[in-house]
A protein has these predicted regions:
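N-terminal segment of the mature soluble domain
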Residues: 67-132
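Bacterial N-terminal signal peptides that target proteins for export
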Residues: 1-9
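Short acidic/His/Gly/Ser-rich catalytic and metal-binding motifs that mark active-site loops
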Residues: 84-88, 140-141, 202-207
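Surface-exposed short loop/turn segments
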Residues: 114-116, 121-188, 214-217
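Sec-exported extracytoplasmic/periplasmic mature domains
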Residues: 82, 105-117, 138, 201, ...
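A solvent-exposed, charged loop/short amphipathic helix patch at secondary-structure junctions
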Residues: 88-100, 152-164, 207-226
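C-terminal motif of bacterial Sec signal peptides marking the signal peptidase cleavage site
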Residues: 16-19
Length: 259
């Protein structure tokens, strides 16, 4: 087969797969934590005390010693703060930014609502979530497509993330999303916990622990997300929302699906 034919075949395959993008699950494994890239903006009170959080894939957290969340049955999600670097602000359309913060809010509500009442005012028994988006870099869709269409290009780029010191399956042009989050007592404003994390998109992701079908689904999802500017950001938001809900349930001694 000639190089031209191979190129045409690759283009056709990309178009076919891209048409199936909406059929792939978002999945929590299409992004991975990269603590080295976590941005410390001063939004949180003490970064030095943070350690790798249990149940997370790299997020750094601190929580008040002896914290008992059983006394809390409501949660308030404060208006999100956006503290991006100048070069990142220039690359984000204001309409996209609003859509992304709205998406994150709805994702948190979806994850937390089964176990806690969502309220809009602080008070006794309320955990207040303060969130700052600190990194927001869209995927360079053009570079992702070129890495796929160049014959054998995907072989080299599949290992480029690790070579550059990033997560396995990532490449230098994929989306990056960072946040800092603070959990406050709604009555006293005492800091209950704090976390920081940055998630990097994984174009070549595989969840090998979920079996062959799960690994294939994750690979397809990660691959297809690399052709959409903000898909990895939405995946990161969903991942954080589920992790927060899971940790809340563990500390409250209940199921994440029960109030």
């Amino acid at each position: 087969m000639s190089h031209q034919a191979k190129y045409a075949t690759a283009v056709g395959l990309l178009v076919l797969l891209n048409g199936c993008a909406n059929m792939a699950d978002s999945g929590s494994n299409v992004t991975a934590s990269d603590p080295k890239k976590a941005t410390r903006t001063g939004f949180l009170s003490n970064y030095a005390k943070m350690e790798k959080a249990p149940g997370g894939d790299g997020a750094l957290c601190w929580r008040q010693p002896g914290l008992d969340l059983k006394a809390y049955n409501q949660v308030m999600i404060s208006r999100m703060v956006v503290t991006l670097k100048d070069e990142q602000i220039k690359g984000v359309d204001p309409a996209d930014l609003k859509a992304l913060t709205d998406y994150f809010y709805k994702s948190l509500v979806t994850a937390l609502k089964p176990q806690m009442e969502i309220v809009d005012k602080p008070g006794a028994g309320v955990v207040v979530l303060r969130i700052a988006l600190t990194d927001l870099v869209p995927t360079s869709v053009g570079r992702s497509a070129m890495g796929t269409l160049i014959p054998y290009g995907f072989v080299a780029e599949a290992g480029s993330g690790v070579a550059a010191g990033g997560p396995a399956g990532s490449t230098p042009y994929l989306g990056q999303t960072g946040m800092e989050i603070q959990f406050l007592d709604g009555a006293t404003e005492a800091i209950l916990a704090e976390c920081i994390d940055t998630q990097i998109g994984r174009k070549y992701a595989a969840d090998v622990e979920s079996g062959a079908s799960g690994a294939t689904s994750t690979w397809i999802s990660g691959y297809m997300n690399s052709f959409q500017s903000w898909s990895y950001a939405r995946n990161a938001f969903d991942k954080w929302s589920k992790q927060i809900a899971k940790r809340f349930a563990e500390l409250r001694g209940i199921s994440p699906q029960a109030k």
